[in-house]
Structure formats: C-alpha cells, structure tokens
Amino acid sequence: MGSRQVAVYFAWSRPDEENAQLGTLENRFTALFESRRIQWPRQEHLADPAKFDQGIAGFLDHILLANFAMFADFASSLTGNSVRIAQRQTRAAHTALSSQWLVGVDTLIIISWDSNRSKQQATPEELQAVRALLDTPGSTVFICPHHDVGDVRELSADEGFRNREAEFHHHGDPAIPSQQRFGMFGRSLLDGLGLPIRNRFGLRPAKAADGGPAPLKIDPSVDRFGLLSGVTTFNLHPHLPHFEMLGESASKFDVLARQPIDLNAPPHPFVERGRDDFDALLQTRQNTFPGQLLISDTTLWTSAAEGFESLQQFWRNVLQLPVR
C-alpha cells in the first residue's frame, strides 16, 4: 500500500492582503505590530523590525503560516512525502490550482483564508482540476473557508451596526474587526461543483471544565471512513464558522461533527435563533464523487488553539486513509 501525497493550497492573493490600508479596520488581516500589542508579551520574540516585517506581511508569515508548519511536518513524517505547498498569488508568481500542480496528489487541502474584498474566484480550469481529482477513487479534498464575521448585506444600517456589535462581543477577540469576511475562493469552487455551502459567522466554541475544547457531537453512523475515530475535540479558535448547506447540498452532505457554542459568551443572533452548536465538519455522501469531499474550517490544520492531541488524531486518520 502506498502513502498519501498531501498538497496545501492557500487561496489568497498576498499582494491584496498585504496592501490593505491599516487605517481601515474592516476586512483585512491584523498587522504584526497590532498582534504584538494585543497579545503582549507573548509575541515579543517577533519585536525586532530589522528581522520581522511589522505589517500584515509579517503577521501572515510569522503568525498565520507558521501555525500550519506543524501539520506539514506531521504529514511529511507520517507519509514519508514532503507536503506540496503553494500560495495562489505572491509578489513573485501566480500559482493556479491546476491539473499540472496536482499531478500525483491524492489529498488536497484548500485553505480559503482569502479576504472577500480581494474577490478570489476559481477559474473553469481550476474547477475542472478539482473535479478530476474528486473523480479519482480514494482521493480526499478538503475545502476550508474561514469565518465570515459581520455580513450585514440584508440589514438596514442600524440593524447592521447592532448585529456587528453583537457578533464582536460574542467572539470577544479584540484583534478581529466588526467585519472580516473570508472564503470566496472556496465558495466559488463549491458553487461550481453544484454543492453551494456558506461559511456563516464567527462563533465562539464552548470550553470543557478543564479549559480545553468541549467534546464534539459526532455522528459515527455517517463516518464511513473513520475520520473521527479517536477524535473527541477540534480546537478553541475564538471565531469559527457554521457551514450552511444551500439547495441540493443538504441532500449531498452529511454532518460528521457539530461543535458546541459557548453559551456563557454574550449572545449571538445564531444562538438566539435556537442553535447551541454549529456544523463543523461536512462530508459528501456515498456516490456523490468517486473520491470524497469534506468541508472544515482552516484552523483544523493549525496548532495554535488548544485541542492539539485530538487534532493530531484527526490528521492521522486522514493521512492513513488507504491509497488506491
């Protein structure tokens, strides 16, 4: 039996993200100097501006991307294959999610941490490449849009302000502005596959009595590949998305895991509508594709928000799926 070849694709445009105006709070990443100020003194090892870019580029390189390094090392160690990693757009090059880039890949993780402001959209050729991978038996594709905080398009100005204020107080993270919307590239792929999903909100997950993540609500009857075998929790990233299935998606996906919401946090409109958990991991039902498609948050592949032992078990389960 062979071992898996993993590829991780960051669907952002680095120039678009890095060039966001710091004087505008909404719809941009935190700059490194802002993160250092909010997290002081935890990140003082990154304080030297001669060594570390203190802007958004520094945050992306030394905080966000660094949090994915442990998964890449873990995957390389377990499979014996180096993880293939690309960013969609850097200052040096554009790397499409093409059939050429995917040669030999059987496990693809698409990190859709792209700001909606940058309007990243999958091209027809990229959609064809992902569909071809899903048409390969034994292949595994994760599409991972991050949170969508402050979507007030259907609200009046006053209602929108109140809604953004409620969302902000619910997640409680001062590093996150009142509107921070991600995931357009991932959603465009799902729309193109005829499986529309929307990443909604930024929900604060519940803690267990020991301070770790509260246990997941897992449906083992639909976990036909055992991806959650031995997995009890995900993480405590303070603003996680609910994955809403639209149209035919509701008949094409199973919800493998729901994550409890922190009901001690200030109320969120989603909670006030009756939910005490959110859909955290979706998987296509049998016969949707010869391969399998899953939807998760980007942070399931990072090491920065507690629950690490259980996350490692999840990674192990994914990486040890049989290769056909």
Task: Please tell me what each predicted stretch does.
Residues 1-324:
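Short, surface-exposed patches at the edges or C-terminal ends of soluble domains, predominantly
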